[in-house]
């Protein structure tokens, strides 16, 4: 519980800093922001490598995971769609209900409002002595698939937002090649897995993705550049490692410290919105951004409703696994409520 509170506090502190620092740093702020963004990507890569390391399945039983995968996909997609419907039919005036741009914008916004599973969930369940339970084993599989589906659902969103450009086909090919490599070489390579080694791999993953972007930008210009986010390459790198848990106080402190820094940097990455109006900047060119600014009380109300819709969507697994008691299925679904670092990373990538 202390760790969850720390994550939330650091996210809020980062958000506050994102509104204060632009005015304080003035012309130096773009350089500061670029440095902070680099650290954020490295931290995100570190987290995703560790998520991939937890992806431990018996490849001989791959058919039995098919149901789990589609349940996890629906568990990732249903909250997204519920929130999208709420954004369009509740937050927008009726004249925009049939507007294509409004739907595209709000499908994108709702993707980043919908939750993903949290790695801290496993620690919480283990602390409750549930590590040997059916719920723990099942939620471990669903949570990893939930994170993977969150990454894959970004692809149709990219197509929806920018159209069928050839660069997206390149990205899709790379995605499927990475997934194929991850499956074929699952838990194959004996690599060092101390925190500093994983941090080094994280820097390399970020460096490679940036190199692809810069080279494509050099040859094809900004419009033709290829963006490969660190989420999937880092996840696959974790998959191909032969998982070896290094248990020590120093390892736990380092991993927690990087997660804490990541949450602060996610908050820091938020754009300046205090003192801005709907007619300011790029907001005026979008349907959603051109709507009148709501009061803080109204915003808080909608946050509560969106949270309830998210959790309602996460109840999807309760309707499956009928061989288990309803109480177990409900506990499994409630366990998926938690918000994780992957979700924060997706918000940043937005």
Model-predicted segments: where are they?
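Structural signature of hydrophobic alpha-helical transmembrane segments
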Residues: 32-48, 100-117, 164-177, 222-236, ...
């Amino acid at each position: 519980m202390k760790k969850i509170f720390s994550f939330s506090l650091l996210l809020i502190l980062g958000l506050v800093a994102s509104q204060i620092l632009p005015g304080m740093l003035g012309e130096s702020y773009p350089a500061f922001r670029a440095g902070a963004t680099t650290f954020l990507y490295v931290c995100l890569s570190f987290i995703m490598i560790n998520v991939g390391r937890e992806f431990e399945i018996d490849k001989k039983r791959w058919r039995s995971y098919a149901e789990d995968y589609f349940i996890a996909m629906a568990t990732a997609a249903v909250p997204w769609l519920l929130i999208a419907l709420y954004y369009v039919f509740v937050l927008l005036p009726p004249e925009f209900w049939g507007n294509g741009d409004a739907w595209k914008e709000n499908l994108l916004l709702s993707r980043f409002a919908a939750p993903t599973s949290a790695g801290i969930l496993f620690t919480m369940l283990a602390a409750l002595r549930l590590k040997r339970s059916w719920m723990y084993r099942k939620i471990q599989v669903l949570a990893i698939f939930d994170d993977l589906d969150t990454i894959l659902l970004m692809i149709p969103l990219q197509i929806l937002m920018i159209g069928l450009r050839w660069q997206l086909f390149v990205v899709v090919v790379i995605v499927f090649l990475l997934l194929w490599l991850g499956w074929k070489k699952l838990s194959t390579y004996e690599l060092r897995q101390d925190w500093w080694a994983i941090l080094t791999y994280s820097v390399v993953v970020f460096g490679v993705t940036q190199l692809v972007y810069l080279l494509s930008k050099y040859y094809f210009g900004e419009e033709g550049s290829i963006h490969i986010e660190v989420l999937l390459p880092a996840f696959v790198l974790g998959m191909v490692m032969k998982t070896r848990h290094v248990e020590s106080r120093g390892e736990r402190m380092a991993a927690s410290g990087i997660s804490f820094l990541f949450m602060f940097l996610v908050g820091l990455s938020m754009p300046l919105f205090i003192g801005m109006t709907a007619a300011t900047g790029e907001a005026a060119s979008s349907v959603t951004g051109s709507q009148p600014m709501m009061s803080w009380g109204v915003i808080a109300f909608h946050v509560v409703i969106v949270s309830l819709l998210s959790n309602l969507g996460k109840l999807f697994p309760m309707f499956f696994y009928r061989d288990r008691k309803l109480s177990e299925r409900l506990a499994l679904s409630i366990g998926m409520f938690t918000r994780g670092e992957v979700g924060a990373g997706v918000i940043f990538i937005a």
